[in-house]
Amino acid sequence: MELHAIVAGKDIKGKVEEQILPYGVDKLFVFDGEGLFPYTSAPHTDILVNLFKEEQPQIALMGATVIGRDLGPRVSSLTSGLTADCTELEIGDFDDRKAGKHYDGLLYQIRPAFGGNIVATIVNPEHRPQMATVRPGVMQKALYEGKAKGEVVYPEVAKYVPAEDYVVKVLDRHVEEAKHNLKGAPIVVAGGYGVGSKENFDLLFEL
């Protein structure tokens, strides 16, 4: 099994290769084009959909980020299905007792369900690619110990993205730095209407 990676953006050729290849990537696809940054849904969706039709990957993984949560469901229009916000992934065999079939090397997609009360393990035996988004930080990064020898491919963007995909343009971006990292917080304190007043909310900050 080979590991392929895809990166898309503007003026990234020659800048991203050495950041990605050391993680053991066998083939890196670099899509570099004027309309690929800032992110908009249509161009990036068509890049993945059309590339997947060519490459026929068994598994496709994305980060469960703001972009990943938008892009993943759109790409799963390939009728591949998608498991969102996975906290663990495993490879294993699966027996479908109802259908009487055995499957080798499926992706076990593990995620909390029903408000975190249970952990669900999901498999996609029939459709490809097996798609999942993974929550950032739940898996340890492992650098490839050998020399990075991955192949780098620079596809022609126009072959994958039609001109009408660029009809939506980002005119301005306003990014505010979060005051508190709620994702990494072990305990979150919140207040509601019962606090009574703005002054009483200040007491929560002391906690």
Regions found by a protein language model. Give the residues of each.
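N-terminal glycine-rich FAD/FM-binding segment characteristic of electron-transfer flavoproteins
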Residues: M1-L207
